[in-house]
Amino acid sequence: MLEAKHIALIEEAARLGHANIAQLRLCFQLLSVSAAIDRDCATRLAPHGLSEGRFIVLFLLHGAGGTLPPHELAERAGVSRATISGLLDGLQREGLLQRRSDAEDGRRLQIVLTARGKRLADDLFNQHTQWIGGLFDGLDGAEQVQLSRLLAKVWQHTDSGRSSQP
């Protein structure tokens, strides 16, 4: 499961006599699982001409009833306005969304899913959620709860986790 770079780092840490080899291995296992999920996700979305970012934009638009202003899409996706602009350009070229003037304020834009974009969002969201659910088929309910708790505990010791605590 470990990638070659992680094995090399563990071997070097062991050679240098570091005592936290087990923790390094756990971290690298977590990183390897995450990387595998990212690769699998990219492989599943690529035939549709989608990156994860584009998929998230489709999903957010679909969940909002098919229409949102670009700044709100950027905020919900957690990306900059420049990034959302690039994602929207690509999705528009593919015919999955359109930019339209706001009916109440013609200076503002609304991003609107096309019928093709809505169909793709419907299909992919169902496929994607089933695939993600299948990743945890080997864990019973109690194990899933335990894993969630353990991951939350690890997250609390990351810089992001510490900075989000009151």
Regions found by a protein language model. Give the residues of each.
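C-terminal regulatory/oligomerization modules of transcriptional regulators
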Residues: 1-19, 142-166
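N-terminal leader segment of winged-helix/HTH proteins
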Residues: 1-48
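Short alpha-helical "packing" element that flanks the helix-turn-helix/winged-helix DNA-binding module
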Residues: 54-58
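Short capping segments at the starts of secondary-structure elements
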Residues: 64-69
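A short acidic, leucine-rich amphipathic alpha-helix
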Residues: 72-74
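Key DNA-contact positions within bacterial/archaeal DNA-binding proteins
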Residues: 82
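Charged, amphipathic alpha-helical coiled-coil/dimerization segments
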Residues: 89-149
